[in-house]
Amino acid sequence: MAVGKNKKMGKKGAKKKVVDPFTRKEWYDIKAPSMFNVQHIGKTLVNRTQGTKIASEGLKGRVYEVSLGDLNNAESEFRKMRLICEDVQGRTCLTNFHGMRLTRDKLCSIVKKWHTLIEANVAVKTSDGYLLRLFCIGFTKKNARQLKKTSYAKSSKIRQIRAKMVEYMQKEVQGSDLKDVCHKLVPDSIGKDIEKACSYIYPLQDVCIRKVKILKKPKFEIGRLMEMHTDVSTFTSAEGEKIERPDDYEPPVQESV
């Protein structure tokens, strides 16, 4: 039997039509909480809504790591903030604080020889139900009149300093909500307070909160998220400007209403 050509079969090695994956994607703006100077920090891509796959659901839960220098327009910042997308309104992703850490180069630059490195960490719950774990780091410091090359602290002093670190981290976080905690982390006021409080035990330097992790979150509430994105200073009064006019001024007569 002669073998004929099957017209239904396609040609061997036929090229498939290449579809650009970016044609089915769309851009969304990323908005940071109002505690930072810069709110619009960038854009993100997601596949368009197709059938049961909704675009906004694909964005929720995304974590963005942004330099604090970009958020506050400051070049000298050495912290990285983690922001998580919790809600999507229109083409805008509303983010919330999700963590913080020091940059690698800063962490390497503060580590010194001939000094004692002291670390402490504690899990604390904020007043609005967020469970945070804070990591603190500090280094011993030479006295002004010290001739000795090294400045190592005794283990008893290290225990006292570590207890002081835990005490101050608990005190600063327990009575504050997440927004207040972020306001304290940006200038690192907690690290400065710890350094001052431990000065009578042993002189310290470069004390800072090196990392913050969110272990547990309360149930999501849109009202609480909107508070993070609302700045009281942005609202202005609705009063108009006063225009000086002569006493005999009469408004012009309109030809048609």
UniProtKB/Swiss-Prot annotation:
Region named Disordered: 236-257
SMART domains, A to Z: Ribosomal_S3Ae
GO biological process: translation
Cell location: Cytoplasm
GO CC, alphabetical: cytosolic small ribosomal subunit
One Pfam family here: Ribosomal_S3Ae
PROSITE patterns per record: RIBOSOMAL_S3AE
One of the record's GO molecular function terms: structural constituent of ribosome
Positions with biased composition (Basic and acidic residues): 239-248
Annotated keywords: Cytoplasm, Ribonucleoprotein, Ribosomal protein
TM regions (residue ranges): none
Subunit organization: Component of the small ribosomal subunit. Mature ribosomes consist of a small (40S) and a large (60S) subunit. The 40S subunit contains about 33 different proteins and 1 molecule of RNA (18S). The 60S subunit contains about 49 different proteins and 3 molecules of RNA (28S, 5.8S and 5S).
Family per record: Belongs to the eukaryotic ribosomal protein eS1 family.
Name this polypeptide is given: Small ribosomal subunit protein eS1
Gene responsible for this protein: Bma-rps-1
